[in-house]
């Protein structure tokens, strides 16, 4: 799974990550892409969406790279507040946040099932060279 925000610089990094995973010598399947901080929704206007960092950047990248789009997570104050008290925001009941996390979870499980039904187990990435690495000093 690759997670990106909608900003161009973040999308460029996500694109590089996908390309790395898809290299023949690495060959790690990408389950899909999630767009974090997709839009801002103020608590007092829960129906309003403000696309502060761009719109559907990760969704467009998923289409371009032919990998599934798993969903988007908004910026809302309750995510920060839940994190501050150690309670996962995904455990909120009947909120836009819980709906977003539930959608990402459902899509991820669906893609995992497809991956397991159609692809062999992923092999461990083997390190074949130490070029560019420093020796470890003990």
Residue ranges and their predicted role:
Residues 83-98:
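C-terminal boundary of histidine-terminating zinc-finger modules
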